[in-house]
UniProtKB/Swiss-Prot annotation:
Gene Ontology CC annotation, any one: nucleoid
Recorded name of the encoding gene: ssb
Record's protein name: Single-stranded DNA-binding protein
Single GO MF annotation: enzyme activator activity
Pfam families documented for this protein: SSB
Lineage: Bacteria, Fusobacteriati, Fusobacteriota, Fusobacteriia, Fusobacteriales
PROSITE patterns, per database record: SSB
Domain SSB residue range list: 1-104
Length: 154
């Protein structure tokens, strides 16, 4: 299973562009804190900078509502690409964002507030957007039979 979950801050404003087919895509980078132990300070932190891309409605949502420094929660998958440059094989990795959420809520004064877990304090349920293909109205049983037989087949 290829699943990536990130919680970080945008390092720059997202770039919202449209492909030849008219489909939106957005490129952005997230700084994600990571604790590590150094010889001088046992509880140090550093940040990993992770390149991301989103498509369709998710890209439009990011382009409209997110800016540099804004906290973002992201679910997606890791994608590897390879190409040659000056005779050298280059490998790059990017996270494809399938869904995103606000990592903090804006208050009426324009400041942001987060809980101790970095989750939004907002009671709004409309702060998540997912890529097309997921039907929120479908049942969550994934097509499983409704009756369970207690007999084992072996």
């Amino acid at each position: 299973m290829n699943l990536v979950v990130l919680n970080g801050r945008l390092t720059r404003d997202p770039e919202l562009k449209f492909g030849q087919s008219g489909k939106a895509y957005s490129r952005f980078s997230i700084a994600v804190d990571r604790p590590f132990q150094s010889s001088s300070d046992k509880n140090s932190q550093t940040a990993d900078f992770i390149n991301c891309v989103a498509f369709g409605k998710t890209a439009e949502f990011i382009g409209e509502y997110f800016r540099k420094g804004r906290k973002i929660l992201l679910n997606g998958r890791l994608q590897m690409s390879q190409y040659e440059s000056e005779g050298k094989k280059i490998t790059t990795y990017v996270v494809i964002a399938d869904s995103v959420e606000f990592g903090e809520a804006k208050t009426s004064s324009g400041t942001t507030e987060t809980s101790s877990y970095g989750r939004s304090e907002s009671k709004s349920t409309n702060n998540t957007i997912e890529t097309p293909g997921f039907d929120e109205n479908s049942s969550d049983d994934m097509g499983a039979p409704t009756e369970i037989d207690d007999e084992f087949p072996f």
